[in-house]
Structures are given as C-alpha cells and as structure tokens.
From Swiss-Prot:
Originating species: Homo sapiens (Human)
Cytoplasmic compartment segments: 1-606
Biological processes, Gene Ontology terms: calcium ion transport into cytosol; learning; neuromuscular process controlling balance; regulation of cardiac muscle contraction by calcium ion signaling; regulation of cytokine production; regulation of release of sequestered calcium ion into cytosol by sarcoplasmic reticulum; regulation of store-operated calcium entry; regulation of synaptic plasticity
Matching Pfam families: MORN (PF02493)
Lineage: Eukaryota, Metazoa, Chordata, Craniata, Vertebrata
Protein name per UniProt: Junctophilin-4
Keywords: Cell membrane, Endoplasmic reticulum, Membrane, Repeat, Transmembrane, Transmembrane helix
Role, per record: Junctophilins contribute to the formation of junctional membrane complexes (JMCs) which link the plasma membrane with the endoplasmic or sarcoplasmic reticulum in excitable cells. Provides a structural foundation for functional cross-talk between the cell surface and intracellular calcium release channels. JPH4 is brain-specific and appears to have an active role in certain neurons involved in motor coordination and memory.
InterPro entries linked: Junctophilin, MORN
Amino acid sequence: MSPGGKFDFDDGGCYVGGWEAGRAHGYGVCTGPGAQGEYSGCWAHGFESLGVFTGPGGHSYQGHWQQGKREGLGVERKSRWTYRGEWLGGLKGRSGVWESVSGLRYAGLWKDGFQDGYGTETYSDGGTYQGQWQAGKRHGYGVRQSVPYHQAALLRSPRRTSLDSGHSDPPTPPPPLPLPGDEGGSPASGSRGGFVLAGPGDADGASSRKRTPAAGGFFRRSLLLSGLRAGGRRSSLGSKRGSLRSEVSSEVGSTGPPGSEASGPPAAAPPALIEGSATEVYAGEWRADRRSGFGVSQRSNGLRYEGEWLGNRRHGYGRTTRPDGSREEGKYKRNRLVHGGRVRSLLPLALRRGKVKEKVDRAVEGARRAVSAARQRQEIAAARAADALLKAVAASSVAEKAVEAARMAKLIAQDLQPMLEAPGRRPRQDSEGSDTEPLDEDSPGVYENGLTPSEGSPELPSSPASSRQPWRPPACRSPLPPGGDQGPFSSPKAWPEEWGGAGAQAEELAGYEAEDEAGMQGPGPRDGSPLLGGCSDSSGSLREEEGEDEEPLPPLRAPAGTEPEPIAMLVLRGSSSRGPDAGCLTEELGEPAATERPAQPGAANPLVVGAVALLDLSLAFLFSQLLT
C-alpha cells in the first residue's frame, strides 16, 4: 500500500490520499477551492488515472485520464445530455454516442469535441440523418429521412425548414394534436421537421399569394398598369413574360408549360393539406448544416424536386414533378420559379427556352449523381454508428470501474483524515513552487492544475523512500533516547580503522574519553544530521521503526588551530537481510552535501585521539612484559 497524507493548495484546494516519491500515487481525493469540484479515484505519479470528476454545476466525468486530461474511454454527464465513448486530449474524439434528454442522439465519429467524419443522427421526432459531418455540422453528402407528417416535430419558427444538428439543438415541443376530421395539418400553421418541399397550398405558396394579389405578377400591383390593361388581359412579350411569378401562381393558373399565359384571373385553389402518413426524404449535398448544392427531395405522395439547393430552399436550375404527373422546370430563386426575368433582348422565345432546358438537364443530372454519392456515404455512416455504439458500451463498463475506484479513494481518505489532524506546520509554496517553510509534516508533492495536479511536483531534499517502507512523518527526531544501550556505531563494523579497532581497545578508548569529558565537551550535532541518524524526508530508519534504544556517542573536538575535516554520512533506510545492525550504514562521500556537518572547532582531532590510544597500548604492553 502506498503511503498517504494531506496536501493543502494555496488557493484553498486540498488533496488527501496516497503518494509516492513526492507525487500523488494510489487512491486519493482532490478538491478545488471552497470544495468546488472534486476528483476521487486512482492516481499515477502525480496525475489522474481512473476515477470520477464532479464539477461545481453537478456535471460529472467517469473514466480514464492521462497526463491530467481525459484520455481513453469515459462517460460525461450533464443536466441535459450524456456522452459515452472515446476521449482524446481532454475532448470528445474518435468514436462515441451523444444523447439528449429530448431524444436527440448522435452516434459516429468525433474530432476536437465535435461531430466530424461519418455518423448517424436521430432527432427527437424519430427522423434521421446519415452521412458526412464537419465541425459539428452536416457537411458533405448525406440522406435526411423524415417521419410521418403527423409525427414530425413542429418547428418553433415558421421560417425554419429543418431541425438543426448537434447538441446545440434545444428540445422541440411535441406537435399539437390534429383537429377532428383532419389527419394531417395545414403547413401554414408551422413547418415540420424534415419537410422542405413546397407544393400547391404549402406554406410558401400561401404566403406568396398574400404578397401577390393578382396572378399576373408584381407589375399588376400598380393601379396605373391595371387601368391600362383593363381592356385586355393579354400582355406583350416584354411585359408579361418578363414578370416574376410565384411557384403556386404558375401551378394554379395553367397546366401548360412554364411561362404560358392565362386567359383570365386564376381561381383560388383550396389549400392542399399534407396527408398525415406522408414522409419526405432528401439525398444530396449539405453545407453548413443546410441543404446546399445538388440533391433530390421526394415526398411519398409523388411530389419530387431534382436540381440545385441553397439554404434548404430550391435555388438555381431544377425540375419539380407534381403528384398528378405534371412538371415545371426552370430557374428557382429562394424556392420560387423565375420565368427568365424581364426579357431585355430580342432573342426568339424558342432559343431562350432551349438554353434554360439545357441548364435544367445539367442540374438534374448533377442531382442524380449527388444522390448516388449520398447513398454510399449513408452506408459508411451506418457502419461508423454501429462501431460507436460498441464504444459506448465499453465506456459504460469503464465508468463503473471508475465509480468503484472513487469509492475506495474516499474510504482511504476518511481513514487518513484522523491521522492528519495532529498539530504541525504545513509546507506552503511560493509562486515558483519552492518550499518557503521547514517541513514538519510529510506532504504529497502533487501538481496543481485547477483542481487536480498536472505537472511535476517539487522533490523532497533527500532521496525518496523505498516502496517497501511504511509511511513516516518527515519530522526529524533523534534516534538516541535517554537510557539507550545502542547507537548508530554500536556495531564494530561501523568503527573507522584509525579510531583503534574494536573490542577491548574500544572500551579503553571510551573510558579514556569519559575521564576528559568535562573539559573536552563541545557543541553537539544539530537535529536531523546524519550523525544522529536524522532524516530529511518522510521515511525513518529501521531502528526508528523498531523503537530500539541507542547509546549517544561522546562528542569529538579538534585542537585549536587545526582545520576541521567534514564528515559526510549517507543514511540508507529500509529493511536489510543482515539484521538490525545493518539498519544504518555509513558511506563517505566525495563532496560535502547539504546535510553534511563539518567538525566543530571544539571537537577532538581523530589523529590526536589515535596517537593517545596507541601510546596507552604501548605502555600496557611494556607493563605486561615487566610482570612476566
């Protein structure tokens, strides 16, 4: 199990959980300032790995993380929609399924958080679009299939002719119930999702009749022209045939070819109601979420248009076929047929009609090619949608694991919280992330990025503890309690050779130093120095963990005028196979480190001590010879 603790951010955030090598590692919980936002789950070397993030507004993410960003499989939930699938660089990417509470759903490819590539979108009323996408909008070739007219969503604005794509589309209210005896509904009461063709009595036709009281065109709005033409209804080629007439006017006024003259004012046709079971499908080009380019739209009752489109309207050259089999063709402008505009040349009418016919044929041929391309893209989009559904299922499974990891992290945080309530100064960091106060309590050096760590944390002054060691607070304590019988140099192996060896010689040296202790006593070493077995990081020595008592060593001093030599010790902590005596080892370093303490001026010189010990041994040897 990884060691654990608590880390307080300067902005008020907090992390409680495990860490390793100065970074968040294992299970942990990280909260933002004022407990706004929380991540709980697994951590890996300072970054989120698998867990649950809950935002201030209640939205959540459950899944994989990498380098502080959402990466892999995951589920994001907000108040009005849910996304399940793959993530790339913190954004929705590759493949996934997006669903809204209104019933709108997209399944397919994603890029940079938007629908991009191939996918299938199902609208709130049940209609579908299958085809290409770009930057979250329908763009390229695709097929839009509507539901029966009485089930189609009622658009809020009469000017709208299509449902918008993507999660930006708000929920559409259900369509009103039809009146008794009316299976469908009048198009004038509002547009329906997926229905864009305007036939006799449709919305565009009704509005055009209101704007054009007479069927002869906008020239008849003038009272002066009406008076001049009161004697005869037939107009000249330069006036009558050059007028702008609406689509409904041409359809109602005559059953002949476009541009034919009417023998009298046309009779007002009753509004044609769309059957409740009628459906409509469009296959062709899309640009910026609208029908634009070449395409074909066909209704189940036989109404059909082939040609050019712009902004969900017939615009350009095309051909319209009515349910009764009659046709009209020519140039359309904003969903209305234009009969060549005002004639400003003396070209024969037959020659002019021939040029229009040629352009119409080219437009119809382009529309049919667009239908073929759209059908191919439709099949690809269906396959990508099936793959996205599989990714969504896998993401849901990962989300369940993330929830379990979050539960474990919260349990561990609750267990660690009482242990961390002991008083003590906590480390604070300046703007550059360096410690400005002494470390009295171990802290996980995690990376701060908003609510969660994102970059490297400041390392502790000493080498990190081994993964096999249990956690210990970094407060440096002396391992030499009163009354102890062992010290860091209690083993004979730890004595330097120039100090006289081991055994009885060491006892004689200790007795000799004890006699002069009062006069040779110098300033003792500082807390945390290697001589006292102190430590500068969170892990203690093996002796400290076992609670063994150690005997303090007498201080050493050097005679006046001699240069003190620094003594460097590296304390290696951790379990050892050579027994408790090997708990603290010493190693001479080439250069003095930050934790090295040079000998004090009042300490004894090791050379002098060695010389005195050698003299004492010589005297003892001579005395023994005299006795023998």
